[in-house]
Amino acid sequence: PLGPSFQFGRGESVFVRYRVLGFTRSREARVHLECTLDAMDPRGIRLVETQRKTVDTELSPEDKDWAPVLLHEFVIPPLADPGRYRIAITAEDKLSGQRAQAEVFFQVRGPVVEPSDTLVARNFRFLKGEDGPVVAGPPVFQRGEMLWARFEITGYKIGENNRIEVEYGLSVLGPTGKEIYAEPVAAAERSTPFYPHHYLPGILSLNLEKAQPGEYTLVVKIRDLVGNQQYESRHRFQVR
């Protein structure tokens, strides 16, 4: 068992093992159990489909102290929210009709992305590289460098079967305010995941090899095709 302070990371596997006791044996020494496991996030939304295990066997006389041990495994979604998660286990004795239930909790660590009722980009930051570090202070880049930016998209609508259709692009305004570059669809997410994550990570890059010194504006445009929403944000940076 894990200690009370243990926290799982997103994308990690969780293994659950338990023993079932007090079940009925038929005259033929038969045992028949149906067990289920559900894993739910802090909002009560299931992470994966209900897992089912069946124990249907006949015991021999030397099995008088035998009890079934069941093992489940599931993966925490890579975009799961941090917080307290719940595992609910049910065991049903098909011979007697009795049911037993148990629950256990575990913690998941990860970044917090504030939810929104409408489409928005959160936590925009300029980076010095694809994986950081974050630009501290005014965003100033040298000509020839690669500009990177990251943000989280939330507030999009989720369609039937958890359908998500979000795309985003960029444009760059030069020192005079005129658009000098555009990439309408830099990336897109079109999926129907079982677990409806409430945000998506966004990343953009821009080659400054031909940029002249001056102040520029990076315009981020996001479109939610399921909810028919659009969002735009502007972020200034300098090239020296």
Predicted regions and their residues:
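Intrinsically disordered, low-complexity terminal regions enriched in Ser/Thr/Pro/Gly
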Residues: 1-240
